[in-house]
């Protein structure tokens, strides 16, 4: 119940938008102002569903598309565009998420105590849009230097967090306000459609935005500006749609901050109990009963109910702390894996679309299939047991992810740092080859023909780009080749015959600060085309040669 309106719990998986509203009636808090009754919005096709909710649902779909689309590519943006390491990228990603989860408190305070829900949504949505625009501009390589990109990105993310979190406690409650008190069934169905819009926006955006990032090239690389620009455009659409329905909305004035009243009640009860902690004073049934000298029995009863619910929520922060790693550590893990499904390559940041997809699939499966079957078996599968089962499954999922990560680390390619590079050799000649690189003591043993390369050898460079001299000996003959090596690169030196003599070719892959297990390279040498798949630190490499 929110300000006298019975709303349902809209807790979305990983969504800061869905705040838990304390069941405190409007009568518990003195209203600041009384306004005349609002004009009721016309019904949709003669039903009891107000036309105004259509604008709210469309707004929610576009806003969720905007938020999840931007967030899907955020970690890879930190790693590959800002060139941060994985630890820093993960820390900033979760700091942003934390701010998104905290700012609903600010939004609720503003809406309840000052502006009301409608104006709060409008003003903070404008802040939201500005943040998106700044974030998109910061992803354009030609705009400033590295420091400018970081400043623009952090400023944009701060505004986005304030905007997206600030409107969270308002939108769902504002939708509930549009219904008359007697239309409980219609209001409950509205929240079902509202939740569907949330997951539909999340599903489409987490699948599409990574395609815009990796499938479209701009400024000579992945198009992060487009990946952030499209969500920005959707947020502008969300704001315009919401404002369009202005004349149809039922707007309730701010009626005081309920959360503040609850906190005051709890503090007063604790202080009163401490002051009267004496054997001569009779004990009370519940510690909150010590607030009865100042607060109504109704408010005290409702606060008791709220504290009981909060006690059940104690394990939830641990669950969500793990769950939110889908966008950080799990996405980074996906960059080290082979996601080629018979020609369809799943982008690492696209993995997140599985969450809303499975939500939409499993909700009807569980509600109309599994749970009725459990009831037929006379198993008392209470909500608490469902929560416990979900947490156990989450633990098993992270155990599986840990095992996968250990296997990846065993075979992961090394990450070169500045003034450092790595090299390995593939011999396509018909006999053994002895190879030396001037200034380095590497490759002491002859390299056999078509031998799977050994582990990468490290090259310490004197500058960000250095020429190396490669000397090869084959059947009593020797030749020398010069190659340019960039810092922070992983190189494949290919030896092959050309006109009866041996020569070399280098194929390089520039590191972006993250480990890679699979590296597919293509080298064109005279009379043959080589496609080589390196599986780092493994003897399971393979090559295909087309003559």
Task: Enumerate the predicted regions with their spans.
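Hydrophobic transmembrane alpha-helices of multi-pass solute transporters/permeases
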Residues: 2-474, 489-516, 522-547
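Short acidic/polar inter-strand loop motif in beta-rich domains
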Residues: 473-481
């Amino acid at each position: 119940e929110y300000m006298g309106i019975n709303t349902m719990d809209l807790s979305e998986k990983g969504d800061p938008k869905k705040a838990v509203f304390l069941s405190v009636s409007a009568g518990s808090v003195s209203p600041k102002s009384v306004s005349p009754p609002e004009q009721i919005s016309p019904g949709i096709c003669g039903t009891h569903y107000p036309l105004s909710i259509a604008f709210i649902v469309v707004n929610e779909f576009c806003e969720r598309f905007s938020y999840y689309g931007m967030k899907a590519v955020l970690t890879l943006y930190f790693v590959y565009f800002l060139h941060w390491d994985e630890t820093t990228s993960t820390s900033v990603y979760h700091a942003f998420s934390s701010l998104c989860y905290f700012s609903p408190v600010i939004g609720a305070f503003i809406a309840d105590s000052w502006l009301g829900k409608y104006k709060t949504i409008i003003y903070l949505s404008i802040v939201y849009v500005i943040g998106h625009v700044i974030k998109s501009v910061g992803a354009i390589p030609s705009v400033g230097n590295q420091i400018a990109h970081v400043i623009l990105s952090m400023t944009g993310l701060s505004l986005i967090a304030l905007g997206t979190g600030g409107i969270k406690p308002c939108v769902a409650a504002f939708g509930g306000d549009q219904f008359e008190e007697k239309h409980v069934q219609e209001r409950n169905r509205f929240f079902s459609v509202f939740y569907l819009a949330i997951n539909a926006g999340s599903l489409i955006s987490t699948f599409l935005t990574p395609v815009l990032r990796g499938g479209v090239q701009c400024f000579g690389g992945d198009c992060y500006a487009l990946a952030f620009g499209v969500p920005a455009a959707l947020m502008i659409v969300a704001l315009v749609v919401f404002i369009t329905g202005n004349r149809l909305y039922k707007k309730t004035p701010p009626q005081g901050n309920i959360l503040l009243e609850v906190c005051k009640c709890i503090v007063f009860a604790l202080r009163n109990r401490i002051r009267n902690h004496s054997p001569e004073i009779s004990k009370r049934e519940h510690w909150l009963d010590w607030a009865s000298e100042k607060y109504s029995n109704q408010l005290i009863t409702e606060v008791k109910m709220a504290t009981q619910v909060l006690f059940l929520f104690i394990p939830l922060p641990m669950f969500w702390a793990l769950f939110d790693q889908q966008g950080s550590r799990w996405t980074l893990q996906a960059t080290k894996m082979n996601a080629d499904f018979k020609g369809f390559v799943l982008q690492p940041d696209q993995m997140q679309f599985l969450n809303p997809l499975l939500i939409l699939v499993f909700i009807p499966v569980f509600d109309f299939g599994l749970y009725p079957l459990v009831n037929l078996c006379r198993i008392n599968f209470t909500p608490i047991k469902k929560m416990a089962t979900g947490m156990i499954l989450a633990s098993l999922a992270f155990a599986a992810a840990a095992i996968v990560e250990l296997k990846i680390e065993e075979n992961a390619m090394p990450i070169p740092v500045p003034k450092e590079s790595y090299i390995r050799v593939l011999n396509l000649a018909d006999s053994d080859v002895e190879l030396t690189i001037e200034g380095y003591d590497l490759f002491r043993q002859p390299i056999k023909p078509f031998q799977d390369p050994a582990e990468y050898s490290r090259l310490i460079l004197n500058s960000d780009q250095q020429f190396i001299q490669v000397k090869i000996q084959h059947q009593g003959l020797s030749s020398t080749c010069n190659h340019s090596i960039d810092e922070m690169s992983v190189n494949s030196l290919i030896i092959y015959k050309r006109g009866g003599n041996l020569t070399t070719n280098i194929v390089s892959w520039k590191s972006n600060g993250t480990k890679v297990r699979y590296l597919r390279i293509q080298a064109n040498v005279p009379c043959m085309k080589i496609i080589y798949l390196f599986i780092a630190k493994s003897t399971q490499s393979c090559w295909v040669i087309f003559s």
